[in-house]
Amino acid sequence: MAETRTRRRSFIRQHSLSITSAAVLALWIYLYSRSNPSTHIGSFFGNAIADWTGLLVMVLATKYLFERGSAESRRPPKNFMGSALQRLRDHSLTIFLLVTGLGWVFLYASLDSESKWGQVVGNIVSEWTQILGLVLMTKILIERHSKESNR
């Protein structure tokens, strides 16, 4: 029993950032679904959904995916793979952001941009663009005194 509890705590402890981020995102979604988007608070909840979706994707995507040359991405493990698979792995973060970003764009195009959820999805498209831009820019550009630029 104690071993199971320790293992459970360990899992929660090891994934607490992604779990908490997902919980906060779920809270914003719940609050927005109950609010009037024409009010300040309703508009805030809608914007918070896009922001926290972006935060959650940064936490999870940079945990599991890679982007060769980007200071924002962790280094891929050194093991032998076929060159095509290695290229896919080395750029999996950009590929993931492009594919899911296109999904958000298609969803946004199918919605009324002025509707309650259309505004949120539009903000998510903007967030995805920012994340992809950050990943791509950090492959080339540097920022003085940034620990990521020292790599």
Residues covered by each model-derived region:
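Sequence termini and other peripheral, non-core segments
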Residues: 1-11, 23-30, 119, 139-151
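Membrane-interfacial, low-structure loops and terminal tails that flank and connect transmembrane helices
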Residues: 2-9, 73-88
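N-terminal membrane topogenic signal
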Residues: 7-19, 87-92
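Phenylalanine-focused residue identity feature
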Residues: 11, 44-45, 66, 80, ...
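N-terminal first transmembrane alpha-helix
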Residues: 12-18, 24, 28, 43-49, ...
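Alpha-helical transmembrane segments
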Residues: 16-20, 52-56, 92-96, 128
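Hydrophobic core of alpha-helical transmembrane segments in multi-pass integral membrane proteins
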Residues: 20-30, 95-107
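A structural feature that tracks compact, well-ordered secondary-structure segments
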Residues: 32-64, 71, 106-143, 147
